[in-house]
């Protein structure tokens, strides 16, 4: 029997704190107090983007935010998340 490795855990470090999330549920990033990862910045929507493990990789998906999600100056609706 072949066992598959567990999906990688997503760890987010922000403002001196650290949170880890397992695959299987969506992680909401935004300025709302109930967001999984809260960023209290007026340029960030209440539920700005969703982090999701899909097809073997973690993705950051813009959630229809007013200001959009940018990477290196380009507006990106979906971004692959890579380990640093």
Regions found by a protein language model. Name each.
Residues 1-42, 52:
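Intrinsically disordered, low-complexity acidic Ser/Thr-rich regulatory segments
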Residues 26, 37, 47-84:
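Forkhead-associated
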């Amino acid at each position: 029997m072949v066992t598959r490795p567990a999906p990688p855990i997503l760890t987010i470090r922000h403002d001196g704190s650290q949170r880890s999330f397992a695959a299987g549920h969506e992680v909401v990033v935004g300025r709302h107090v109930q967001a999984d990862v809260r960023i209290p910045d007026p340029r960030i929507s209440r539920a700005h983007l969703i982090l999701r493990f899909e097809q073997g990789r973690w993705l950051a998906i813009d959630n229809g935010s007013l200001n959009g999600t940018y990477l290196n100056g380009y507006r990106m609706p979906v971004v692959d998340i890579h380990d640093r």
